[in-house]
C-alpha cells in the first residue's frame, strides 16, 4: 500500500462506516421519500444523469465560476486596499464583517425580485457568501510579511512595488490558496441556495423540484453531484498549490 493510500485510509474507513449506518438506518425507517438509502440515491443519480449533467450542472457551474471570479477580484482588491492604508482598513473591514451578518436566505429572494430569475441574482448570492473568506485570508497573508525584510530591502533602494511583489506576494500565496479552497465549496453552496430560492435551471432548482414531488432520492442526487464537484475542485487547487508554493520553505 503506497503512502497516498495509507494517508487516505482513515477517511475512507470513516466514509464507508457512515454510509453503512445510513444504509441500515434508511432501511429501518423504510420511507424513501424522507430518507432514501445511499444505493437508491446512486440509482437515481444514474437515472437522471442526462438531465443533470447536460442541463442543470452547467447552469450551476456557470453561476459558481462567475461568482467566484467576481469574488476573487473583489476580495483581492479589498485586501490590498486594507493592507496599503490604515484608513481603508478602518473603513472597509467593519463593512466586510457586517456583510456576513445578513442571512443569505433572507437577502436572496430580494435579489430575485430585483434582478429576476436570470444568472445575476444567483451570482450576487454567491459573491455575498464567498468574497469574505477571500478578503480576510488574503489580508492576513499580506500582513504576515516580515517588516524586517521590507526594511532591509528599503535600505537597498527597493520601491514599495518591489516590496509588494518580492515579499508580500510570496508570503501571501499560501493564504491565497487556502482562501480558494474555502471559497470553492462556499461558492457552490451560494449558487445552489440562489437556485433553490428562484431559478429556472440548476442543481439547486432541480433538488427543490424533486422535493415538491416527494422524491427523496431525487433531492439528494443533485446534492451528491455538487459535493463531488466541490471535492474534485478543491483537490485540483491543492495539487496546484503544491506545485506553486513548494519553494516556500526556501524563501
Which residues does each PLM region occupy?
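N-terminal signal-anchor transmembrane alpha helix
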Residues: 6-29
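Transmembrane-helix boundary motif in ABC transporter permease subunits
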Residues: 66-96
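C-terminal transmembrane helix and the adjacent membrane-cytosol boundary/short C-terminal tail
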Residues: 86, 143, 220-251
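Generic hydrophobic transmembrane alpha-helix motif, especially the helices
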Residues: 97-133, 140-141
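Short helix-to-coil transition segments within interhelical loops
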Residues: 142-148, 152-172, 212
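Glycine-rich helix-loop "coupling/hinge" segments at transmembrane-helix boundaries
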Residues: 113, 189-226, 251
